């Protein structure tokens, strides 16, 4: 073999070695690139999971805020209803003596006297108008004559034996009671049969 042939053979061997080294380098590079991609995928998956958890947390926070808003709105509406419903309580309580006095005037007036008769009719009309006006605002009269005694609506002044009335029934109403929107403003003062 000549030098030239040796050289050609050596060059071919060197080329094969270079190609082999290049292929090994490609394999190593591909493996490291694959490892890098897997690490990147794992990192992205972790970021995705964290983002999903954060979104779920934000959705939960929004739902809680909406529920709290609804609760606040409902409580405010209830408070307004209560205020509207019972705003007249003190005012109505102050009107009760006026009603009592008009009723006393009718009871004590001389119905036989012609001059007083016209006055009593005027007082009676005034009382009726007054009662119908306050009833529009939820004030109702408790007049339990002949009814069974109810401690929630009646205040017993005393008990008295009576053959004309059943036991535990109201036989005399000393002072009428009043409720405002189903809440007792003043119980009726009564005498109860034994």
Swiss-Prot record:
Family annotation (InterPro entries): GrpE, GrpE_coiled_coil, GrpE_head
UniProt entry keywords in alphabetical sequence: Chaperone, Cytoplasm, Stress response
Disulfide feature: none
Top-level division of the source organism's lineage: Bacteria
Keyword Cytoplasm attached: yes
GO cellular component, one term: cytosol
Chief location: cytoplasm
Gene Ontology terms describing biological process: protein folding
Subunit annotation: Homodimer.
Job description of the protein: Participates actively in the response to hyperosmotic and heat shock by preventing the aggregation of stress-denatured proteins, in association with DnaK and GrpE. It is the nucleotide exchange factor for DnaK and may function as a thermosensor. Unfolded proteins bind initially to DnaJ; upon interaction with the DnaJ-bound protein, DnaK hydrolyzes its bound ATP, resulting in the formation of a stable complex. GrpE releases ADP from DnaK; ATP binding to DnaK triggers the release of the substrate protein, thus completing the reaction cycle.
NCBIfam families assigned: PRK14139.1 (NF010737), PRK14140.1 (NF010738), PRK14150.1 (NF010748)
Protein name in the entry: Protein GrpE
Species this chain originates from: Aliivibrio fischeri (strain ATCC 700601 / ES114) (Vibrio fischeri)
Gene designation per UniProt: grpE
């Amino acid at each position: 073999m000549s030098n030239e042939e040796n050289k050609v053979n050596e060059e071919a061997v060197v080329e094969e070695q270079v190609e082999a080294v290049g292929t090994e380098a490609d394999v190593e590079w591909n493996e490291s690139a694959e490892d890098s991609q897997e690490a990147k995928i794992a990192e992205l998956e972790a970021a995705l999971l964290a983002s999903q958890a954060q979104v779920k947390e934000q959705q939960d926070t929004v739902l809680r805020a909406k529920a709290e808003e609804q609760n606040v709105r409902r409580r405010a509406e209830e408070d307004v209803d209560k205020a509207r419903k019972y705003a007249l309580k003190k005012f109505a309580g102050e009107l009760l003596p006026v009603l009592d006095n008009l009723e006393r005037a009718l009871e004590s007036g001389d119905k036989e006297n012609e001059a007083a008769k016209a006055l009593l009719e005027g007082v009676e009309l005034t009382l009726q108008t007054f009662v119908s006006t306050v009833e529009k605002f939820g004030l109702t009269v408790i007049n339990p004559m002949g009814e069974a005694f109810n401690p929630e609506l009646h205040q017993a002044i005393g008990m008295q034996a009576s053959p004309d009335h059943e036991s535990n029934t109201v036989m005399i109403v000393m002072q009428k009671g009043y409720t405002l929107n189903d809440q007792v403003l003043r119980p009726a003062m009564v005498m109860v049969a034994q």
